[in-house]
C-alpha cells in the first residue's frame, strides 16, 4: 500500500534499539487489557486498550484468525546408549510419529541411537529412534515408537511449551500461550496477536456485526529466525503448512462485495490469506506457504492488520512496513517505546486501519 524507496531493501533499515525492560516476560491479565496502539491513515497515533476494539471496527468488517494450536514441543530425555541428557524440540510431523526435530547435543545423536523420555529411563514413557540427520536445519529425524494416540497422550504429560528465547520465565499456565479459539494442533509458536482476545470480546464483536473467519497456519521455528542478508530481496522465507477453508473464502468474498474490510489478526493470517491468493484468485485448500512480504508487495486481500511489536531486522517488520511504510512503522515503534508499551510475544498490540476514523 506504500511505494518503496531504495533504502527499504537494506536490512539495517529495519533496526531499532529496544530497552530490555520493554520485552514482556508475562502476559497481561485479563487478556484484553493489553494496550493497543492504533495506526490510522495520516493522523496522530491513538492510544487505546484491546478491549476498545469493538469501537474501532465497524459492522461488516471481517477478522481473519489463525486457529492453530501450539504443541508442548519441548521434551527432555536421555540417550539410551550413554545416559547423556538430551533436549528435543519437535518442529514438524511428517507422518504418524515421524518428526523433524532440533536436538541438543546434536553431535552426539547419530542415526541409529535412541532417546528415552520420562522420569524413569529404565521404564520410559516415550522412546524415539534417530533415523537421519537433516542438513537443511541441522536437526534430526526421529521416529517415536508406539501408537499415535499414546504418543499424543504422553506428549501432553512430558512436553513443555516452547516459549521464544527472549522470554526467560516458564509458562505457569500453558493455556496462556494459546489463543482462546485455537483448535488445530501443530504450531511450535503461538500466533501472538490473537492472544489478546477473550470469549466475551469475540461475542461483543459478533453482536455488533463484526464477523470472524478461521485459517490455519502452523507457526514453525522460522518465525524466530532473523533475516541475515543485507539486501532483503535475497532473503529466502521459511515455509509453513497452512489451510484456508472454503467457508472462509466465501466470507471474504461476501465482505468485499458488501464494502467491508478484511482485517488479519496477526502476520500468520496475512501470509495464509495472501498466499492463498498468490495466483490472483483467492482459493481454498491446504498447501505450504513461503510468501515473503516486504515493501513493494502488491496486496491482494488484506485491508488492515492487528499485530504485536516485532523484533528488529525481522521479516515480520518488513511485512508490516509493506502495509504502512517503513519510516512510519519505525516512528510508531519509537512512540511505543517512549510510551512504555510492552514488546514481542506477550506484549501489547497495534491496530493498523488505513481508513480508520476516531470513534
Swiss-Prot record:
Which InterPro entries does UniProt cross-reference here? QueA, QueA_dom1, QueA_dom2, QueA_sf
Biological process (GO) annotations? queuosine biosynthetic process; tRNA wobble guanine modification
Write out the pathway annotation from the protein's UniProt entry: tRNA modification; tRNA-queuosine biosynthesis
One Gene Ontology molecular-function label: S-adenosylmethionine:tRNA ribosyltransferase-isomerase activity
Q: Predominant location of this chain? A: cytoplasm
Any one GO CC term of this protein is: cytoplasm
Cell compartments where the protein resides: Cytoplasm
Q: Which reaction does it catalyse?
A: 7-aminomethyl-7-carbaguanosine(34) in tRNA + S-adenosyl-L-methionine = epoxyqueuosine(34) in tRNA + adenine + L-methionine + 2 H(+)
Q: Which EC number(s) are documented for this chain?
A: 2.4.99.17
EC primary class: transferase
Which Pfam family, any one of them, does this sequence belong to?
A: Queuosine_synth
Q: Where are the transmembrane segments?
A: none
* Xref: HAMAP family: QueA
PANTHER family linked to this entry: S-ADENOSYLMETHIONINE:TRNA RIBOSYLTRANSFERASE-ISOMERASE
On assembly, the entry states: Monomer.
User: Which family does the record claim for this protein?
Assistant: Belongs to the QueA family.
Name-wise, this protein is S-adenosylmethionine:tRNA ribosyltransferase-isomerase
The species this protein was found in = Synechococcus elongatus (strain ATCC 33912 / PCC 7942 / FACHB-805) (Anacystis nidulans R2)
Organism ancestry: Bacteria, Bacillati, Cyanobacteriota, Cyanophyceae, Synechococcales
Amino acid at each position: 500500500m506504500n511505494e518503496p524507496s531504495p533504502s527499504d531493501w537494506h536490512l539495517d533499515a529495519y533496526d531499532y534499539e529496544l530497552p530490555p525492560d520493554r520485552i514482556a516476560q508475562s502476559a497481561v491479565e485479563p487478556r484484553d487489557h493489553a494496550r493497543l496502539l492504533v495506526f490510522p491513515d495520516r493522523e496522530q497515533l491513538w492510544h487505546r486498550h484491546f478491549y476498545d476494539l469493538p469501537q474501532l471496527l465497524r459492522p461488516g468488517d471481517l477478522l481473519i484468525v489463525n486457529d492453530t494450536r501450539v504443541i508442548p514441543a519441548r521434551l527432555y530425555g536421555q540417550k539410551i546408549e550413554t545416559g547423556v541428557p538430551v533436549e528435543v524440540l519437535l518442529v514438524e510431523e511428517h507422518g504418524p510419529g515421524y518428526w523433524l526435530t532440533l536436538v541438543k547435543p546434536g553431535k552426539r545423536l547419530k542415526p541409529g541411537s535412541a532417546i528415552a523420555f520420562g522420569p524413569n529411563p529404565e521404564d520410559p514413557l516415550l522412546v524415539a529412534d534417530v533415523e537421519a540427520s537433516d542438513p537443511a536445519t541441522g536437526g534430526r529425524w526421529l521416529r517415536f515408537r508406539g501408537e499415535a494416540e499414546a504418543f499424543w497422550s504422553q506428549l501432553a504429560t512430558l512436553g513443555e511449551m516452547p516459549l521464544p528465547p527472549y522470554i526467560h520465565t516458564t509458562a505457569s499456565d500453558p493455556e496462556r500461550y494459546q489463543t482462546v479459539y485455537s483448535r488445530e494442533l501443530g504450531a511450535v509458536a503461538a500466533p501472538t496477536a490473537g492472544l489478546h482476545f477473550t470469549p466475551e470480546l469475540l461475542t461483543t464483536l459478533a453482536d455488533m456485526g463484526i464477523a470472524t473467519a478461521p485459517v490455519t497456519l502452523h507457526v514453525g521455528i522460522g518465525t524466530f529466525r532473523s533475516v541475515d542478508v543485507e539486501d532483503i530481496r535475497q532473503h529466502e522465507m521459511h515455509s509453513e503448512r497452512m489451510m484456508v477453508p472454503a467457508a472462509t473464502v466465501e466470507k471474504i468474498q461476501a465482505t468485499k462485495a458488501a464494502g467491508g474490510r478484511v482485517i488479519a489478526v496477526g502476520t500468520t493470517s496475512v501470509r495464509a490469506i495472501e498466499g492463498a491468493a498468490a495466483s490472483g484468485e483467492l482459493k481454498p485448500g491446504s498447501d505450504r506457504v513461503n510468501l515473503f512480504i516486504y515493501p513493494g508487495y502488491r496486496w491482494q486481500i488484506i485491508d488492515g492488520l492487528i499485530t504485536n511489536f516485532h523484533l528488529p531486522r525481522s521479516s515480520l517488520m518488513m511485512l508490516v512496513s509493506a502495509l504502512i511504510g517503513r519510516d512510519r512503522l519505525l516512528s510508531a515503534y519509537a512512540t511505543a517505546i517512549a510510551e512504555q508499551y510492552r514488546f514481542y510475544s506477550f506484549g501489547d498490540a497495534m491496530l493498523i486501519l488505513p481508513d480508520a476514523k476516531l470513534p
